[in-house]
Amino acid sequence: MGKENYCFLSNHFSSYEMIYSESKDCVEIINPFSNDNIIVDYIPEDEFTPYICQFSFQHRHYENEEDVVEYISEIINQNIYAIEFFKDGKNRFGGDITTHELSELSYEFLEQRSGYYGSTKLKDVVDSFKVRGWNPCNDFDATFVYDDNGDITIVKTNYK
């Protein structure tokens, strides 16, 4: 295993500093804006999805270099962000959210997207969430606030 397994990243992201770690056998694409770097691992023993891409709270498994490049490009171009949900400060689950979805963000949207809209509601399993992007100017933390009618609104905190 070695650095040669990550050459394809240099071809696409040469304007970013990349650090290869022999001890961890991974490449880290350095984020010039924050500490949320992109880490790519290659695990050849996994014949189906040998690449793991990590950004912020999230990770994804990929089977080929092209999909890895596409995912990283989406992050760097700020088309997708990492979103993580919490309950009492503990991670519950997460995923990605697009720029368009962020522009129309509502509790109802998050509930539908998460799948917690049946007998178990999103509000029953989480109480806050965080959004992180390549450029932290769009990062924020948020909580759910309930009004007297039972309606839920999102209140952003730690907005950059």
Task: Go through each PLM region and give its residues.
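Histidine (H) residue identity feature
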Residues: H12, H59-H61, H100
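Surface-exposed polar/charged interaction patches
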Residues: H12-I19, I75-Q78, Y116, S128, ...
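Hydrophobic beta-strand residues in large extracellular and virion-surface proteins
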Residues: L9, V27-I29, I38-V40, P50, ...
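Generic recognition of long tandem-repeat/solenoid scaffolds
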Residues: D25-P32, P50-C53, F93-G95
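Short linear motifs in intrinsically disordered
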Residues: E17-Y20, D36-E45, I83-G89
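Amphipathic protein-protein interaction modules
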Residues: E66-K121
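N-terminal "first-domain core" detector
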Residues: M1-N35
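Intrinsically disordered, low-complexity regulatory segments enriched in Ser/Thr/Pro
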Residues: S34-D67, E111-K160
